[in-house]
Amino acid sequence: MNHKIDKNEFKKSVVANVRNLYRKNIEEATAAQVYHAVALAVKDMIIDRWIATHEEYDKQDAKIVYYMSMEFLTGRFLGNNIINLCEQEEIAEALKELGFDLNAIEDQERDPALGNGGLGRLAACFLDSLSTLGYPAYGCGIRYRYGLFRQQIKDGYQIEIPDEWLKDGYPFEIRRSEYATEVKFGGYVETQWDGQRNHFVQKGYQSVLAVPYDIPIVGYGNNVVNSLRIWDAQPLQSFNLADFDKGEYQKAVEQENLAKTIVEVLYPNDNHYAGKELRLKQQYFFISASVQRAVKKYKEKHDDIRKFYEKATFHMNDTHPTVAVAELMRILLDEENLGWDEAWEITTKTCAYTNHTIMSEALEKWPIELFSRLLPRIYQIVEEINRRFVEEIQKRYPGNQEKVRKMAIIYDGQVRMAHLAIVGSYSVNGVAKLHTEILEKQELRDFYEMMPQKFNNKTNGITQRRFLLHGNPMLADWITDKIGDEWITDLSKIKKLSVYVDDEKCQQEFMNIKYHNKLRLAKYIKEHNGIDVDPRSIFDVQVKRLHEYKRQLMNILHVMYLYNQLKDNPNMDIVPRTFIFGAKAAAGYKRAKLTIKLINSVADVINNDRSINGKLKVVFIEDYRVSNAEIIFAAADVSEQISTASKEASGTGNMKFMLNGALTIGTMDGATVEMAEEVGQENMFIFGSSADEIISLENKGGYNPMEIFNSDQDIRRVLMQLINGYYAPQDPELFRDIYNSLLNTQSSDRADTYFILKDFRSYADAEDKIDKAYRDEKWWARTAMLNTACSGKFSSDRTIEEYVRDIWHLKKVKVELPDA
């Protein structure tokens, strides 16, 4: 049964927590202190369910998926946990009676700094769905001390500062030091013969202790609580008193500093050797700890390690965790003393891999020198996997050295992690139909031809519980009022909204909710940016990681183009528009950071130009993260999904906008293709070259953007403004690198690598269609409602059911709580 809380007991619990934690009465407590007290009271409600869930898993001897990911971009937990416990009204009321507003208390929580982009957010959505559907799972990751970084904008530039999310402790985590695990780096491997077989022993290594912290992942309304297990790195001996007494203070804490470095930040800059080494260390650290712990857990109840795969699946989210293939082999060979063939059979029935990108820079490769020095035993195992695989290739394709060059795991001084994953897994999936097709026909074609049975598609999804129920409560209530609440756990039911799309009263209600959400975002922008934006203007939004293929540059060039038109003709009839950007650029990615500066420079000029009467505004939202994303998705009119076709594997922001009733302007790329199948292309603004056209142009070595520059005076004018000081009077050369990248003047890359100028006119036409369409209020309202009604396919619940059916083969578990 699902226990409901007693409101008065909850109030007592919060008051007691404030006293015990801070030696204060509730009236004296700060909002941050009340947040901690409320979080602990909610955690108390979770604990019984958490224990009951794991007891049920043990009782049923359930198969578990270990979802291994470098990132988990969870967002705040308090609000989500309260919603999934189905206690929102009671708790909001209890806090109101104590004199506090639940939303204000939720705002005290720092977003956990455990991820950055879509990869990490997908992992978080998957965990939410696994718990809600009742499937046994562990998320396995790293407990970063500072995450990627907190973004500040100073003088238009991105400044990276540490994200100190753990400064005041994190109330939802539990330290599990009893499961601490030793992880070994470096040294050498000694071979010892026992008369029957060789034993491989790592000697002269450095060790760190991996200590797990568990965060509960609460299922919606079903008592199921899975765990996100994040590993902290600690020294085996943290403080050497003997060294300290000799006055060698640095040496005394050397081990501690070594360990701490591993978990300091997500994606340390790898433009240099030390950064590369640290990244590989991080990956092996959390994978070794997770794999060792999974094997130990299995052995607590089972004697036959040969059946390990019947009770565990290791799912590798992108290439970062793929060293799991070799680590499981190491344990089976060296610790369980199995022969190679047996160990390989178990490993290849345990590991599954999701490919997230066709961008070659993201398909990780490690220099042999680094890999073999840092992980000597793992390297030996990878060498042997490679030797056997190359033999297989040669048997299959005699004399074809080209196949070996393209497919070998170790080649040309590098260890290719994606190849290790494909060879060592029983399943390889892409994340949208188009992406999987490109993998099979282009990027991984040789592998697909050799082992087609491994390949499958699993189109990504999002959790409607965070991005609609929590992020857009007004719309969620309205939908429930119209069609009931089944959509919360079965998003396909949202299709029932279709019957209301032509109802004028419903259209008005729907757009009124959108307006209220725009007011909420306008307030956020005023508070954080000091910019007044008109909630009646079109909110045109692009929020996502900053990368050249995502083409934020094309968006801001189009804003410059529109501004030029307005300056030439101040009476031009356009619907006022607010262009909203949010993005972090990787710390070492110069051009991406320069693009942020360009957006902010354009914003400064446009927002301060009174002659255009506020018809255009440009806003860059600082430190884009899950908590402000929820506010942004709910308020958007237009969703910018404008990646170069073929480059975006799936995208999930596109789905969040659609669910919240925004209209998409986009290329036929990633999952946007499938969104068009669901809602109809006529209800989106599709533009630009197709994936096939882009791939064909790339195979020919690109195109000549100078022809466009010479023949299109509007585009030429915009590009000249990059180098004539129009947006940087103090430093006219500031944006020269962007100009060069588009026209290949003194640039090492191919001219306009991402086909921005090629697609520009088509993009500008689509943007113009938006201006015309927005004037037809009924059409817009109907189309916005239709987008929400057609988003049922894009729930991560559907995605997870497909993973379970085709890849993981888990069984649902029901959790009943004993009567209190």
Language model features by range: what are they?
Residues M1-A820:
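A conserved ligand/cofactor-binding region detector
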